[in-house]
Amino acid sequence: MLTKKTLVMLSTLTLATTCVAFSTPTTEATAKDTYSKKIEAKAETRPILRKGSHSSYVRDLQQSLKDVKYNTSVDGIFGTRTQNVVKEFQTDHRLSPDGIVGPLTWAALDENKVERKQFPVSTAITFGKKELGDNVVFSTDDRLRKDNNDKAYYRFVAKNKDWMDQGGSGTIGWYHIYKSGDVIEESN
């Protein structure tokens, strides 16, 4: 016959095993989803900015654009130049290029900053050399873009050193280099 102490131990063991079996493991996808929600929440707390706006938020926007390699001044005034740069950023990140900075554009800027730290240009060049060889020179505008599948890539022109030494342009072609290491030639 089972003692009271044994029954309590079996109940505790069963409960612990059930909790472990049915707990949701933390995966990279779950962590990324949680992180994305934090970025979106932060983005929603900032104001919508458009041409004619002027504030410290505009200054922050301009600095963020500059940090991710979009050429704009940082003066706190949302003028035509800032609007055009915002449209470039939106186009590069598969957003509607309306020149208005709302939650989606703020979130894309925040995400771009994080992705640039995780996937620097130097890593992309390493992937490119591995694929195309060490005799290739890569040039880029350092902008991290998004493709139709929301995958981040840098756009490079690849040039052959020997061809340049012989007086030619050396251009082999334009390539998209992804965080995964994929090197895809750009089609026209």
Spans of features found by a protein language model:
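Exposed beta-strand-loop-beta-strand "reactive/processing" segments of non-cytosolic proteins
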Residues: 139-177
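Bacterial N-terminal signal peptides
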Residues: 11-21
